[in-house]
Amino acid sequence: CRVENKCPHTVCCDRSRCSCKLIRTRPLMYHVCVC
Protein backbone atom coordinates (compact mmCIF):
# COMPACT_ATOMS: atom_id res chain seq x y z
CA CYS A 1 0.00 0.00 0.00
CA ARG A 2 1.48 3.32 -0.99
CA VAL A 3 0.41 6.76 0.09
CA GLU A 4 -0.41 9.36 -2.51
CA ASN A 5 1.26 12.74 -2.21
CA LYS A 6 -1.99 14.61 -2.41
CA CYS A 7 -3.70 12.41 0.14
CA PRO A 8 -3.71 12.21 3.91
CA HIS A 9 -1.69 9.41 5.47
CA THR A 10 -4.90 7.48 6.08
CA VAL A 11 -5.48 7.05 2.35
CA CYS A 12 -3.25 4.80 0.32
CA CYS A 13 -3.29 3.02 -3.00
CA ASP A 14 -2.25 -0.51 -3.83
CA ARG A 15 -1.91 0.11 -7.55
CA SER A 16 0.43 2.43 -9.36
CA ARG A 17 -2.31 3.88 -11.54
CA CYS A 18 -4.50 4.85 -8.63
CA SER A 19 -5.24 8.47 -7.96
CA CYS A 20 -6.57 10.27 -4.94
CA LYS A 21 -9.71 12.35 -5.21
CA LEU A 22 -11.43 14.58 -2.71
CA ILE A 23 -15.06 13.65 -2.14
CA ARG A 24 -17.23 16.43 -0.82
CA THR A 25 -20.37 15.20 0.86
CA ARG A 26 -21.99 17.45 3.39
CA PRO A 27 -21.20 17.63 6.13
CA LEU A 28 -18.13 15.47 5.57
CA MET A 29 -15.15 15.73 3.27
CA TYR A 30 -12.81 12.84 2.69
CA HIS A 31 -10.22 11.49 0.28
CA VAL A 32 -10.74 8.32 -1.71
CA CYS A 33 -8.32 6.28 -3.72
CA VAL A 34 -9.70 5.69 -7.19
CA CYS A 35 -8.20 2.97 -9.35
Curated annotation (Swiss-Prot):
Molecular-function GO term, any one: toxin activity
Signal peptide: none
Highest taxon, organism lineage: Eukaryota
GO terms under cellular component: extracellular region
Post-translational modification (record): Contains 4 disulfide bonds.
Residues the record lists as 4-hydroxyproline modifications: P8
Annotated localization: Secreted
Assigned keywords, A-Z: Disulfide bond, Hydroxylation, Secreted, Toxin
Tissue: Expressed by the venom duct.
Domains: entry comment: The cysteine framework is XV (C-C-CC-C-C-C-C).
Protein name, entry field: Conotoxin Ca15a
Lineage: Eukaryota, Metazoa, Spiralia, Lophotrochozoa, Mollusca
